[in-house]
Amino acid sequence: MSFTDETVRFEFGDSDKKEIGETLVDVYNVLEAKGYNPINQIVGYVLSGDPAYIPRHDDARNKIRRFDRDDIVEELIKNYLKDNGVNL
């Protein structure tokens, strides 16, 4: 695999953004209901890609796996920046 020094533009649609947010809320609620620390589990999944961090309960694992982890990270960063006064 070769890499380039050129900056690559990465974009995805608005409907995906809403679905990612809704999915994260659903997964958070499932993790909390099962007695896990939701933040730690979601971070573990996003960093490693290992779906074992997310339970199968209420289809949470399949829901979160529909999205690329890069897209999840992008949505999390955008929301954090918006919540902290950055005009995107």
UniProtKB/Swiss-Prot annotation:
Lineage: Bacteria, Bacillati, Bacillota, Bacilli, Lactobacillales
Protein name in the entry: UPF0297 protein YbeA
NCBIfam families linked to this entry: PRK05473.1
Leader peptide range in chain numbering: none
Species annotation: Lactococcus lactis subsp. lactis (strain IL1403) (Streptococcus lactis)
Family: Belongs to the UPF0297 family.
InterPro entries: IreB (IPR009309)
Top-level lineage group: Bacteria
One of the Pfam families matching this protein, by short name: IreB
